[in-house]
Amino acid sequence: RGTLVHMVTTLRIAQDETADELLSSDPFALLLGMLLDQQFPMERAFAGPAKVKERFGSLDPAKIAAADPEKFADLCATPPAVHRYGRSMAGRIQAVAEVVRDDYDGDVTRIWTSTDDPAEIVKRLKALPGFGDQKARIFAALLGKQLGVQPAGWREAIGPYAEEGSRRSVADVTDETSLQEVRDYKKA
């Protein structure tokens, strides 16, 4: 797996040092955090990949894709669960791992580094299991705002989530204060 390109800062999404270090250093962990970010508190969703790594011993997409589905589901559902719907999300994690393994040679960063077209990046993210248009745009905004993945026209291709200074999504979370501002925005 590749490393994140143009790393700008250490991410502070999970509000947990170990989980945030993993999100900052492992792009597949970051993608899985985004996958888990639904019907579950944002910081707990982004702490999920650290739980998977601790319990499974690896975040290698090929190993996760090849894991026994029942055992992997048990690992994700064991309290404290990786997600509120741990067993269901285990299947999605494995499905995303399979796509990364098969379509991107196991290197998740190829989703965004093998093209300069921001619309193509969004399209590739949207095609991942468990990702719709909104989730794809939020993750692309996160890549752009916090990790420096900013091909020409990226803000226009992504839309409102890419707006400078916005507090709409996880793409805007850099500390506890911004996390609360995003929460307040979502409640409004």
What do these predicted ranges mean?
Residues Q39-R44, G57, R101, L147-G148:
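Short alpha-helix boundary/capping elements
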Residues F46-V52:
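Short Gly/aromatic-enriched secondary-structure transition segments
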Residues V52, F56-A127:
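Alpha-helical ds-nucleic-acid-binding substructure associated with the helix-hairpin-helix region
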